[in-house]
Amino acid sequence: MTTILENLPAGQKVGIAFSGGLDTSAALHWMRIKGAVPYAYTANLGQPDEDDYDAIPKRAIQYGAEGARLIDCRAQLVAEGIAALQCGAFHISTAGVTYFNTTPIGRAVTGTMLVAAMKEDGVNIWGDGSTYKGNDIERFYRYGLLVNPDLKIYKPWLDQQFIDELGGRAEMSEFMRQAGFEYKMSAEKAYSTDSNLLGATHEAKDLESLESGIKIVNPIMGVAFWRDDVKIDKEAVTVRFEEGRPVALNGVEYKDAVELLLEANRIGGRHGLGMSDQIENRIIEAKSRGIYEAPGLALLYIAYERLVTGIHNEDTIEQYRENGRRLGRLLYQGRWFDPQAIMLRETAQRWVARAVTGEVTVELRRGNDYSILATRSPNLTYQPERLSMEKVQSTFSPRDRIGQLTMRNLDITDTRDKLRIYSEVGLLTPGESSALPKLKEDESGN
């Protein structure tokens, strides 16, 4: 049975998801001097705040890693991000502004690809920097075990000895300095940031207070659109989809989806598009707050949704949205590769996305302020001549509509009878200022 190790497994190989930051650097060196055999695995997720990926494995070796590998996860990350977009797998929103589940998508890719690399090296113990209060500890647990059923989990941040010796950033910085690495602790920010090519998450510290707003955040994928001194010119951009896949921006075709998303990030980022402030429910049902960036996905999603609504009928769109919200929750919970998620993904990608071919032109302004300027698709079922108020060849006549309205008498009569019954049993009372009935107040006045 898979176990979570509470103490360092001395003498054994331990894989650590290594970012090169202070926490994982100190943890790796600490594990080495305590007798474990650490292996470092770094995921290249196209993080916008990382300048030199090649240097990270080299630092891991300096800190005591027996081996260090850089795993390029960008293509898989973008593939999963586009799959989520095709399915509308986004369940968190506030007043219509969407969080694009960029961190959960990143965890699905990291959790599977890094553990697969560890398995190749005969490393069956995995550690990472997730804490016991967050979502990632469960996401990584699930994805890791899917790839390697023999996996055991060791997290330094769940090891009391590690916590006692290196429980804070100041202690970690001093530990590294005394070890001769001259590791300088970076300036403390008012919040923490986690990012990948799809988007960035800002949370914790000052952002835990709902009295602190988006204005304390320094965007890393776009501009602070709320600042008066930030000049932003409006810009028209055209996005083209073929069978549900984004293939071109402003007439430029991209064979590499990673390059397309990078350009979409640049375009959307110039306007601060895709930033949102969300209160959400973590997997353990406690509420948390995050401020998110996803300029490229936001741009693609605007165009994709426009085409979906112009191509598919109402019932299909309703099912797409309901399934998307459900799939978004599964993704958030670390269940992106579970059977129920695969079933929902297959439905949307096959029967919704494959019909989405066309292009949409959007005018971007500041933040999430935009207008759709044009929509073109050979698959549109929107045909204005069907409902034109002008004198045109119509698909139905006035007499046809009279017949259709007459048929409505059946359900109108049924509704009237039901309202009478509700009134007779005391559920409804006639409104004093309206011909419509209203709910009868209970004894408490509600």
UniProtKB/Swiss-Prot annotation:
UniProt-annotated binding residues for L-aspartate: T131, N135, D136
BP GO terms, sorted: argininosuccinate metabolic process; L-arginine biosynthetic process; urea cycle
Keyword check for Disulfide bond: no
Homology family: Belongs to the argininosuccinate synthase family. Type 2 subfamily.
Subunit structure: Homotetramer.
One Pfam family in the UniProt entry: Arginosuc_syn_C
Pathway as given in its UniProt record: Amino-acid biosynthesis; L-arginine biosynthesis; L-arginine from L-ornithine and carbamoyl phosphate: step 2/3
Alphabetized GO MF terms: argininosuccinate synthase activity; ATP binding; protein homodimerization activity
One Gene Ontology CC term in the entry: cytoplasm
Binding-site list for L-citrulline: Y99, N135, R139, S192, T201, E203, E280
Residues annotated as binding ATP: A17, F18, S19, G20, G21, L22, D23, T24, S25, A43, G129, T131, D136, D194
CDD domains associated with the record: ASS (cd01999)
The reaction(s) this protein catalyses: L-citrulline + L-aspartate + ATP = 2-(N(omega)-L-arginino)succinate + AMP + diphosphate + H(+)
Localization (cell): Cytoplasm
Official protein name in the record: Argininosuccinate synthase
UniProt entry tagged with the keyword rRNA-binding: no
Keywords (A to Z) from UniProt: Amino-acid biosynthesis, Arginine biosynthesis, ATP-binding, Cytoplasm, Ligase, Nucleotide-binding
EC numbers for this chain: 6.3.4.5
Predominant cellular place of this UniProt entry's protein: cytoplasm
Principal EC category: ligase
